[in-house]
Amino acid sequence: MSITPDRRQELIGEYANKANDTGSPEVQVALLTERIVNLTEHLKTHAKDFHSRRGLLMLVGRRRRLLDYVKRQDVKRYEALIGRLGLRR
């Protein structure tokens, strides 16, 4: 259910703006998206896992706030990010 360290490093390398960039909004959104996808798959087989469902909703809300921040800062960066992640919006 969690992201493996190798996958985490792969995502950080792919979405980082510069070397050793782990805190930029793009990296955070990419990591949250990976966790959301994993939790969504988990909930498809465990439909009554309401604790995980609440965690999923919290992750989606956190990702939404980060995306809103990126959109306020730079609309082109926002559009590029949602395009790379394949998010609707």
From Swiss-Prot:
Coiled-coil positions:
none
Question: Its GO biological process terms?
Answer: translation
Q: Which UniProt keywords apply?
A: Ribonucleoprotein, Ribosomal protein, RNA-binding, rRNA-binding
Give the InterPro entries listed for this entry.
Ribosomal_uS15, Ribosomal_uS15_bac-type, uS15_NS1_RNA-bd_sf
Which GO terms label this protein's molecular function in UniProt? rRNA binding; structural constituent of ribosome
Pfam family example for this protein?
Answer: Ribosomal_S15
Any one Gene Ontology cellular component term annotated for this protein:
cytosolic small ribosomal subunit
The family line of this record is: Belongs to the universal ribosomal protein uS15 family.
NCBIfam families, per the entry:
S15_bact
Role of this protein:
One of the primary rRNA binding proteins, it binds directly to 16S rRNA where it helps nucleate assembly of the platform of the 30S subunit by binding and bridging several RNA helices of the 16S rRNA. Forms an intersubunit bridge (bridge B4) with the 23S rRNA of the 50S subunit in the ribosome.
Self-association or partners: how does it assemble? Part of the 30S ribosomal subunit. Forms a bridge to the 50S subunit in the 70S ribosome, contacting the 23S rRNA.
Q: What is this protein called?
A: Small ribosomal subunit protein uS15
The species is: Acidiphilium cryptum (strain JF-5)
